[in-house]
Amino acid sequence: MEIDILSLFPDYFDSPLRSSILGRAIKNGLLKIQSRDIREFGLGKWKQVDDAPFNNDGMLLMAEPVVQAIRYVKRRESRVIHLSPQGVPLTAQKSRELAKCSHLIFLCGHYEGIDERALEIEVDEEISIGDYVLTNGGIAALVVIDALSRFIPGVLGNQESAEKDSLENGLLEGPQYTRPRVFEGREVPQVLLQGDHQAIARWRKQVSLDRTRERRPDLYVRYLYDRESEDVPQMEADPKQSAFEGECAVVLDVENINRSKRFYSKVFKSNQPIGDKLYIPGKTQMVLHLQEVGLKNKNTAVLSLRLDCENDFYSFLGRWKMLGGTLEQADDRGAVRLVRDFDGHLWAISCKKAK
């Protein structure tokens, strides 16, 4: 694979690309990476590459130097990527996809960004490594290069390690242990010492599910939706769930029951609550049992709701935000949206037809 990095600071990449696994991959000819200075394509005697944006502060990279830099290295098979917090999230799946390309061009932004016209003309896609802003796009480019390189045959000493690493199956990896068996009173789990490979595999899967559910509920919900036909190990019954004469009831701890009643009544277009119970309309009768516990004793839950059509999906999200709930995160297909209510409960709202 060949990679060209376009940046105002090409020397920034020298040390990372000479070190460790990436350095070895370049030395062995598995990767060919060049960093180029956008200033080489600057305008006029002083090689100008930036200017003040209209109706805003700071400095912006100009369209012409950026476009000329891209066209200088671009080939028919090239894929041009702009590193930006506005892009699609970088995932293991996206890294696999990029690893199949023969030539990648990474465009690194600086200052307040890049003139939008350059992006519209020459960029194929934008990729984000997270919901935050960096001092320069070079850091993000290195992250993407490192992530995709793991899927290029020969880069890792053992390619199986790339397949087994955390997130490769949609879940966080479980804990790892080495000698000694006991350290400061903490023992290695007994199942790992017995040599029963099937039992170890079951244990690893369960621990991986538990860890993902607790630490990354967004990944856990996506995993469940992506594997609807797959048997997912059943968790122990949640004491917060109970049955009310054939109805499905979910008990939610809330700080202020009147506030929560108003919120859920309006967001679900439900009838007036009966006591502390709120009936959610739909094909399957569900009851929210609101339990006022105050702020200190409140436990938060993760819930899932699937809507039938796209209009209902977006209308529901609109009501949620308008009534004071927060919209947290969407998956890269837009089919699952994570939202939080006033009490911190996380809901995964989904619709198969949403785009």
Curated annotation (Swiss-Prot):
One Pfam family recorded for the sequence: tRNA_m1G_MT
GO cellular component terms listed in the entry, alphabetical order: cytosol
GO molecular function, one term: tRNA (guanine(37)-N1)-methyltransferase activity
UniProt key word Cell wall biogenesis/degradation: no
Compartments (UniProt record): Cytoplasm
GO BP annotation list: tRNA N1-guanine methylation
Keywords per UniProt: Cytoplasm, Methyltransferase, S-adenosyl-L-methionine, Transferase, tRNA processing
Record-listed S-adenosyl-L-methionine binding positions: 109, 129-134
Entry's EC annotation: 2.1.1.228
Catalytic activity as recorded in UniProt: guanosine(37) in tRNA + S-adenosyl-L-methionine = N(1)-methylguanosine(37) in tRNA + S-adenosyl-L-homocysteine + H(+)
Methyltransferase recorded as keyword: yes
Major enzyme class: transferase
Described function: Specifically methylates guanosine-37 in various tRNAs.
Family: Belongs to the RNA methyltransferase TrmD family.
Subunit: Homodimer.
NCBIfam families: PRK00026.1, trmD
Protein name in the entry: tRNA (guanine-N(1)-)-methyltransferase
The organism of origin for this protein: Chlamydia felis (strain Fe/C-56)
Gene assigned in the entry: trmD
